[in-house]
Amino acid sequence: MKRQSEWIRVESIRGARRISNFFWAFILILGALGFLLVGSSSYLGRDLIPLLPSQQIVFIPQGIVMCFYGIAGISIGFYLGFAISWDIGNGYNLFDKQRGIVRIFRWGFPGENRRICIQFFMKDIQAIGLEIREGFYSRRIIYMRMKGQQKIFLTHISENSTLKEMEEKAANLARFMCVSIEGI
């Protein structure tokens, strides 16, 4: 979502609450539970899951490895679940021409630094850029180049926008901030 007036522009940034993350957390926990139950069945010597016979799985080494994979998968699944519930990465980019500031806000993990807020002056921005990498792990990222050649990324790596949409976003932002554009 984007809101814009003559002086202020606000862009919402989606966090971890995506359908794909819900899907992968569910699949990961379900599969890891299967591994853990089959490994535990091989230790106990009886089937904990009626559909998955475990008599042919020896506890050492296969059962131990399956238990390890199950515990690791459940841990990663819960990590992903907590990231979804805390909505890690959610936030906004605020561009205020009237006050001459740019504010980037994101939610992080709970703790002392849960709120991540970066604020700087517009006069320190040299250009708006677009970094494009095509291939198997393609990525398209809009960034701001600051004085001193530091890049500050404004979009997620996982944002699935077409090249034309990303070029338009970068051009509109550069036009709004009255800076040059690079990388297109």
Curated annotation (Swiss-Prot):
PANTHER family tied to this protein: PHOTOSYSTEM I ASSEMBLY PROTEIN YCF4 (PTHR33288:SF4), PTHR33288
GO cellular component: chloroplast thylakoid membrane; photosystem I
Alphabetical UniProt keywords: Chloroplast, Membrane, Photosynthesis, Plastid, Thylakoid, Transmembrane, Transmembrane helix
Record membrane topology: Multi-pass membrane protein
Family under the similarity heading: Belongs to the Ycf4 family.
Organism classification: Eukaryota, Viridiplantae, Streptophyta, Embryophyta, Tracheophyta
Record-given protein name: Photosystem I assembly protein Ycf4
Record localization: Plastid, Chloroplast thylakoid membrane
Pfam families given in the database record: Ycf4
Functional description taken from the UniProt entry: Seems to be required for the assembly of the photosystem I complex.
Source organism per UniProt: Psilotum nudum
Residues spanning the membrane: 21-43, 58-80
GO biological process: photosynthesis
